[in-house]
């Protein structure tokens, strides 16, 4: 639940008074022209913007009733609870196994080697990658194809049992076949997680999301059921973007 969220980069007002609710076990797509603020807003949801010098966030973002911007909040467990999959696959310089096992190890989620192995296997299965790598778990994660690396990053994210998964253009560096696999995976993961995805592809937003939010110049212009946003947008700016009159 986000209320009156504003983001400043120095003097630049990048996100302006955005309020948005995200439902449990739904996929919400954030769309809009380049530079409209959708990725900046996404990064607010697990405080990734904290790493940017000069960035300031105001307003309220609540998860399980707690404002994630409370001064005393530890961001390490927050970023396990709200995982992130980036635009470019970024596996650790470790084996496939260690890429997935690393998070559960540092968060103390496994009490034995057998339990850790179970987490690794179940995470790779949920990411649709187990059958492709089960005999090569000792190989470097970087040895996989781009699409496999992105699914490995998704497995790494879900290995720490998040509630929410944030995806920032997860398919932009992938070919159509790899993209189709990721989209199918997103649909399957919705049964277990809430997902917010930034995408430049309106076709992808239409395929994978239940709701769509349209951003323009740092403002949330419209949010609604995906079918409604694409077929009967309420705001002229949304209609102009959907129909290709600008963007």
From Swiss-Prot:
InterPro entries: AAA+_ATPase (IPR003593), ABC_transporter-like_ATP-bd (IPR003439), ABC_transporter-like_CS (IPR017871), P-loop_NTPase (IPR027417), PstB-like (IPR005670). It holds the Pfam family ABC_tran. Keywords: ATP-binding, Cell inner membrane, Cell membrane, Membrane, Nucleotide-binding, Phosphate transport, Translocase, Transport. It is an enzyme of class 7 (translocase). Transmembrane segments: none annotated. Coiled coil: none annotated. Part of the ABC transporter complex PstSACB involved in phosphate import. Responsible for energy coupling to the transport system. Belongs to the ABC transporter superfamily. Phosphate importer (TC 3.A.1.7) family. This is Phosphate import ATP-binding protein PstB. It comes from Methylococcus capsulatus (strain ATCC 33009 / NCIMB 11132 / Bath). The lineage of its organism: Bacteria, Pseudomonadati, Pseudomonadota, Gammaproteobacteria, Methylococcales.
């Amino acid at each position: 639940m986000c209320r009156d969220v504003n983001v400043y980069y120095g003097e630049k007002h990048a996100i302006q008074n955005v309020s948005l609710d995200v439902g449990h076990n739904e996929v919400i797509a954030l769309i809009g022209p380049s530079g409209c603020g959708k990725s900046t807003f996404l990064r607010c949801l697990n405080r990734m913007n904290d790493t940017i010098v000069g960035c300031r966030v105001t307003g309220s973002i609540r998860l399980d009733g707690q404002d994630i911007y409370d001064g005393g909040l530890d961001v390490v467990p927050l970023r396990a609870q709200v995982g992130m999959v980036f635009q470019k696959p970024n596996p650790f310089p470790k084996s496939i196994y260690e890429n997935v096992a690393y998070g559960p190890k540092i968060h103390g989620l496994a009490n034995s080697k057998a339990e850790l192995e179970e987490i690794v296997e179940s995470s790779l299965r949920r990411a649709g990658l187990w059958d492709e790598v089960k005999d090569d778990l000792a190989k470097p994660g970087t040895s996989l194809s781009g699409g496999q690396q992105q699914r490995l990053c998704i497995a790494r994210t879900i290995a720490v049992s998040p509630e929410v998964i944030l995806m920032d253009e997860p398919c932009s560096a992938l070919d159509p076949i790899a993209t189709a696999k990721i989209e199918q995976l997103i649909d399957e993961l919705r049964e277990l997680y809430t997902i917010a995805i930034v995408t430049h592809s309106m076709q992808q937003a239409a395929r994978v999301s239940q709701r769509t939010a349209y951003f323009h110049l740092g403002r949330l212009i419209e949010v609604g059921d995906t079918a409604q946003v694409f077929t009967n947008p309420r705001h002229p700016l949304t209609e102009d973007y959907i129909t290709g009159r600008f963007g």
